[in-house]
């Protein structure tokens, strides 16, 4: 019996000795004894009141593994218009426990068309829902596995994996479409329908008689309008890529107790912090007289106020609020419209519709004006009432939305109901407008992207005093990076929108390209915005010159204005707030002079053949 007890005790002793040896080896491999000795010695000299709090906060937490991504959740939420969009939540493993970190929402890329047919609206609603649902599936089924275990601060690796994942999805979609096409080709096609021959071309215009007033040569040689380019293809689910990339960047900032814009600035400047941050200049919409407005005027989808660069963001927002208040008051006090003398079909006099305003999805009043001068005269009157000087305290910008104005049946832009102008005539219209109202310093999308020649002409005429900014005409960030050419249209800058598969690394690259070309970066909101305010951090972190947020009459847009104010206050407190430079057109003026010289040279080269054609026509 004693031998058995002795053997048992000997076995336990050997097991304990073995465990002790394993423990010693484990702790020595992790350098625990030395670190604990140093910790206890330093703690003794410090003698903190909360010993264990000091040990955890100032030592053990620093020795722990960095937080790593353990879960990504995609959800469908509603944006500011009640339409579905995507939200992404990030959770990380911190000291062996999963913990929720942050959430972001990303807007969809769809434009809001207020006067669309019900069939078109239903089709777009279906497309939108499919895009969001596919993104949610990608995130919950695949992307979490792709990014599991990565440290959020490793943005480059995160974006690389997201890009690879997206490329595989694009290839899968391509193969699926090819398979569907091959299956359709197996089905016998119906016999072709014989079409009647096309009508003969119209007779040439009569030749000018001697003494007749000479018309413009560009009218005689006017080119037919080019058809619109097919819309840029967007793969359903692509918004998952951009949303997850943004969510990881925000998670990295949250874990480091830094604001998001600081993390983004580090990405752009190779982990170095700028000494100062300049706030982007506000572009605040105050009026809308575009294609969807009930009045005759279509040219001004947005009339935008740009407060002076010498104002702080807080002063700029206060100025915009006061202008908007005055606009609302003006709409309430307008006299009733006069009746027209023209009679309708029933013989009664037809009354002009009242000038009333409603808040558009862009956050500003939609007003039915009938002339280009009306909204500008309204703002001039408001300036007089407030003791402000238009062109000094603030300037104006016009979002023309040229792609929405084109009437393809006539091949011209419909600037007002019943008033159509060719692309060449639009150049003259804009030049006359800027000559009459020099306080307008920016035109957004004055033409379609297909009218590159008119972009060049307008740039040559106005580059020294008015910014030409490409919004819808510039294409998506992904398309620009794919082409590696951001100067296809002659402009001063581009509007950048964070949508679809655009990652943080893509935004770093596109802003570097824009800065390298000495162009202006404008971060802009989409038509249908969510309540997420990350757009402001993107603009500040990546050093945008302007930020276009829409009007101050919708909650989802006011969250972004509030974020702008919070960032400015924080920068001032930290002593890193920088002044914004005044509007400078000198570089663009030199570029425009060179462009005009090239155009003049080209015109001189083409005079001889044109004269030959005219002489041959006379004979």
UniProtKB/Swiss-Prot annotation:
The phenotype of cells or organisms lacking this gene is: Male mice are infertile and the sperm have significantly reduced motility, ATP levels, and enolase enzymatic activity as well as a structurally abnormal sperm fibrous sheath.
Looking up Pfam families in the UniProt record yields:
Enolase_C
Start and end residues of each stretch annotated as Disordered? 173-236, 333-354
UniProt EC number? 4.2.1.11
**Might you name a Gene Ontology BP term for this protein?**
cilium organization
User: Has the keyword Lyase been applied to this entry?
Assistant: yes
Q: Which GO terms describe its molecular function?
A: magnesium ion binding; phosphopyruvate hydratase activity
Q: Which residues form a coiled coil?
A: none
Q: Which residues bind substrate?
A: 302, 548
The record, for SUPFAM superfamilies, names: Enolase C-terminal domain-like, Enolase N-terminal domain-like, Formin homology 2 domain (FH2 domain)
Pathway as given in its UniProt record: Carbohydrate degradation; glycolysis; pyruvate from D-glyceraldehyde 3-phosphate: step 4/5
Listed under catalytic activity are: (2R)-2-phosphoglycerate = phosphoenolpyruvate + H2O
Give the record's PTM text: Synthesized as an approximately 70-kDa precursor, which then undergoes proteolytic cleavage to an approximately 60-kDa enzyme; HOATZ associates directly or indirectly with ENO4 to mediate this process before its transport to mature flagella.
Q: In which tissues is it expressed?
A: Testis-specific. Expressed in spermatids and ependyma (at protein level).
Assembly and interactions?
Interacts with ENO1. Isoform 1 and isoform 4 interact with AKAP4.
The record's comment on protein family reads: Belongs to the enolase family.
Q: What is the protein's given name?
A: Enolase 4
